């Protein structure tokens, strides 16, 4: 499963990770560097497993923890209405 931002959501890299802006509501979310890496991987067409691999490669985190973090991130982004699953290509 890969993700895409829904229409009306902008993304910007920051010194501390990534910021997402919901242009419809004016709300924004700050993602820390690990969440930003995971989301970037998913937005670029990567799978959850690839996002986990990126996290375990670049940070001192085990696969189980990274997997939980990716699952939590995706769930929270879906709940906030910021992302949707990308159509299969």
Model feature map: region roles:
Residues 27-89:
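Long, charge-rich, low-complexity alpha-helical segments
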Residues 1-36, 40, 86:
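Acidic, low-complexity/disordered tracts enriched in E/D and polar residues
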């Amino acid at each position: 499963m890969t993700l895409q931002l829904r229409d009306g959501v902008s993304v910007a890299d920051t010194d501390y990770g990534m910021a997402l802006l919901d242009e419809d509501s004016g709300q924004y979310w700050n993602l820390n560097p690990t969440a930003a890496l995971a989301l970037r991987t998913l937005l670029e067409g990567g799978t959850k497993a690839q996002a986990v691999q990126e996290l375990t490669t670049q940070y001192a985190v085990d696969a189980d923890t990274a997997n939980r973090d990716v699952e939590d991130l995706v769930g929270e982004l879906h709940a906030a209405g910021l992302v949707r699953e990308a159509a299969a290509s």
